[in-house]
Amino acid sequence: MKSITQLENKKVLVLGLAKSGEAAARLLAKLGAIVTVNDGKAFEENPSAQSLLEEGIKVVCGGHPLELLDENFELMVKNPGIRYDNPMVARALEKEIPVWTEVELAYLVSEAPIIGITGSNGKTTTTTMIADVLNHGGKSGVLSGNIGFPASEVAQSVTNQDTLVMELSSFQLMGIESFHPHIAVITNLMPTHIDYHGSFEEYVAAKWNIQNEMTSDDFIILNFNQDLAKELATQTNAQVVPFSTVEKVDGAYLENGGLYFKGELLMHADELGVPGSHNVENALATIAVAKLSGVSNQAIKETLSSFGGVKHRLQFVDTIDDVKFYNDSKSTNILATQKALSGFDNSKVILIAGGLDRGNEFDELIPDITGLKKMVILGESAPRVKRAADKAGVTYLDAKDVADATRIAFEQASAGDVVLLSPANASWDMYKNFEVRGDEFITTVERLKG
């Protein structure tokens, strides 16, 4: 860990705990800051706060009192899930208190160069692919960030012989100042999280923060399937390395079924260990990073051929009576489900879809669901999803939850079919998060197998 002095004796408020807040509080204390932690959960029900108090860190729990900001804090480090219109954050900004997320702290102390991956879809899969390729190629890629390992915790233990492979959300990227990856990847940009950001333009601006401090010695990898990425490519100091599945570019691209980097064939798309056009895009981004990092072609091909996916991201679960089950619970928007379906023969797919109703219609999904064997529909958004199914001419059945939907889908399936959980909706109408939803699917499949 780098030895830094800029936070010594600074009064810092950590707003919100969870994994990242707890890690940030401990790191700040280690760096000599005077730390106060504020979390909305009551102290009696808050083991993280109890643990921090035992370590000598001040904690304020059970609410977010605005008067706490009268204590002359010089910095706020907030949980990325807390919005900027939260009264505590808004008041801090009024007082001109800098507001960071923990990835800024991670950058400040990391001895390792950083590869930062962001985007609307494919972040986790691409991040995991990159780390796997680096490790197989002898480069020591260490996962961190939005993938479940707090960056500020992981960054303390890496050395300059490692590479910190960091998944970054738009929420995290709103709270950076000096953060400077050597390689940045933007998988794609679609209109998601507008309820948080207010507009697509603000969302894109948050993502684009990833390259603010990059120079001509750095690389940014952009998806040239999108015109927006081509526009953004003119607005960075970093060297742009494009990838595309629709045209030959000066980077990584798909041509006649082959995956190329700057004219050199590395492997064929049908050799990838995970299905779907979206995973071809993820693989191309990974190839670009790997080639820039000096990984051999053999290591790239071996890794991508054996890569089995990420839990809840088009994850193969099991086969029962020659029926395959795939868990794609992470598909919380229409684009993600479209990409999941692209990897299968619709006539053999029973799709489980539906979830939180955000007022979206699903007409965009009609071409992608046309020809499905059946759909099983659940959740608040069920009436809207059913309208799309009717327009597509797809037969559907109702289910009360994911377990029920999985059982119904299996009853409708024949040998050679695929049962695909790819909801195209967030999970919060029924489940705490998409992981819990996906775990219910996996557990139900296990029970069906007996």
Curated annotation (Swiss-Prot):
UniProt record, GO biological process: cell division; cell wall organization; peptidoglycan biosynthetic process; regulation of cell shape
Catalysed conversion reaction: UDP-N-acetyl-alpha-D-muramoyl-L-alanine + D-glutamate + ATP = UDP-N-acetyl-alpha-D-muramoyl-L-alanyl-D-glutamate + ADP + phosphate + H(+)
Protein EC: 6.3.2.9
Subcellular location: Cytoplasm
Keyword annotations of the record: ATP-binding, Cell cycle, Cell division, Cell shape, Cell wall biogenesis/degradation, Cytoplasm, Ligase, Nucleotide-binding, Peptidoglycan synthesis
Example GO molecular function: ATP binding
Stated role: Cell wall formation. Catalyzes the addition of glutamate to the nucleotide precursor UDP-N-acetylmuramoyl-L-alanine (UMA).
Protein known as: UDP-N-acetylmuramoylalanine--D-glutamate ligase
Organism the protein comes from: Streptococcus thermophilus (strain ATCC BAA-250 / LMG 18311)
UniProt gene name: murD
